[in-house]
UniProtKB/Swiss-Prot annotation:
Pathway: Bacterial outer membrane biogenesis; LPS lipid A biosynthesis. It comes from Nitratidesulfovibrio vulgaris (strain ATCC 29579 / DSM 644 / CCUG 34227 / NCIMB 8303 / VKM B-1760 / Hildenborough) (Desulfovibrio vulgaris). Gene3D superfamilies: Hexapeptide repeat proteins (2.160.10.10), MurE/MurF, N-terminal domain (3.40.1390.10). The gene is lpxD. Belongs to the transferase hexapeptide repeat family. LpxD subfamily. One of its GO terms (cellular component) is membrane. The keyword Cytoplasm does not apply. This is UDP-3-O-acylglucosamine N-acyltransferase. The active site is at H236 (proton acceptor).
């Protein structure tokens, strides 16, 4: 696909400074050629502006003079994404409902849906208009899938799960498996039935092989606009707010409540029955064992406030040397005590 820079600027509301020309794709500053657009969002790559061969660069206004052709943006990274969408190849071209799909007679599939071979749609399930179900998807009985959704291969929605409009579920996502509920008894470990469900809002994206368990009672929820990375685990009865960013390998234990606009970096672990306030940021590999008030930034295991965490990071590399010095001081102190004792 070939587009003129003036066309892209018009579509995205950007200012074109320099020669109007045709481009056919998007690439990094380092790899882009004369027929490609690039972008600068991270100051770390400022030096590449002078060496890039890109036909045009999406930049903030203060850097427009540093390139021959600029698309001036208030948010270069976001507008890079919008530009990329103009050139991105659509995944899949199947239309209609495959004869190799199994659709229960009581299920309802909306207009314009693409249901690939080897999809199963159970009794009373409802699929919204324009939704795409890739091969191997399992939609259990009484599930509701909104309009404009994309479910990539082998996504599983167990019975009664609901997802809103315009959601993207990547390969291997499982929503509505039983929560981890067991009781120790004199007869061994006994299962507690998990009879609730999972409800996902609209405009939610969930990464590959992420699992969100059904609740014991009630609903496990994820709010509108939240984005969840690959390999994340949400336990039963978790309530997650809107517009959260949850990075890979996060685990949130059962019945924890997470507010809106929360960010959890990679490998964060959150204990159960906690409250994480809106606007909280949790650093990577943190272990959260107590409630966090709204707006806080925390890190570490156990998680502490940012200033304490940063001081801890500063001290940690010095500990081996401090340990040696402490041992030496203890030895000198013992010798001094012995000397004083002998003098008495």
């Amino acid at each position: 696909m070939v587009r003129r820079l003036s066309e892209i600027a018009g579509l995205l509301g950007l200012e074109l400074r320099g020669e109007d020309r045709e481009v056919s794709g998007v690439n990094t500053l380092e790899a882009a050629g004369p027929d490609e657009i690039s972008f600068l969002a991270n100051p770390r790559y400022m030096g590449q502006l002078s060496t890039t061969r890109a036909g045009a660069v999406i930049v903030a206004a203060e850097h427009a003079q540093d390139v021959a052709v600029a698309l001036v943006s208030a948010n270069p990274y976001f507008d890079f994404g919008r530009t990329l969408a103009l050139f991105a190849r659509k995944q899949g071209s199947f239309e209609g409902v495959s004869e190799q799909a199994v659709v229960h007679p009581e299920a309802v599939v909306g207009e314009g849906c693409a249901v690939y071979p080897h999809v199963y749609i159970g009794p009373r399930a409802r699929i919204g208009a324009g939704t795409v179900l890739f091969p191997g998807c399992y939609i259990g009985e009484d599930c509701v899938v909104g309009g404009g959704c994309t479910l990539y291969p082998n996504v599983v929605l167990m019975a009664g799960v609901e997802i809103g409009d315009d959601c993207i579920l990547h390969a291997g996502v499982v929503l509505g498996a039983d929560g981890f509920g067991f009781a120790r008894t004199e007869f061994g470990i006994q299962k507690i039935p998990q009879v609730g469900t999972v409800r996902i809002g609209s405009d939610v994206e969930i990464g590959a092989n992420t699992t969100i368990d059904r609740s014991v009672l009630g609903v496990t929820t994820v709010g509108d606009g939240t984005k969840i990375d690959n390999l994340v685990m949400l336990g039963h009865n978790v309530e997650m707010g809107r517009n959260c960013l949850i990075v890979s390998q996060v685990g949130i234990s059962g019945s924890t409540k997470v507010g809106d606009d929360v960010t959890m970096a990679g490998q964060v672990g959150v204990a159960g029955h906690l409250s994480i306030g809106s606007g909280v940021t949790i650093g990577p590999k943190s272990g959260v064992a107590k409630d966090i008030p709204a707006g806080e930034t925390v890190g570490g295991a156990p998680a502490v406030d940012k200033s304490t965490y940063m001081r801890t990071l500063t001290v940690m590399p010095k500990l081996p040397d401090m340990y040696k010095r402490l041992g030496k001081l203890e030895k000198e102190l013992a010798e001094l005590k012995k000397s004083l004792s002998e003098e008495q």
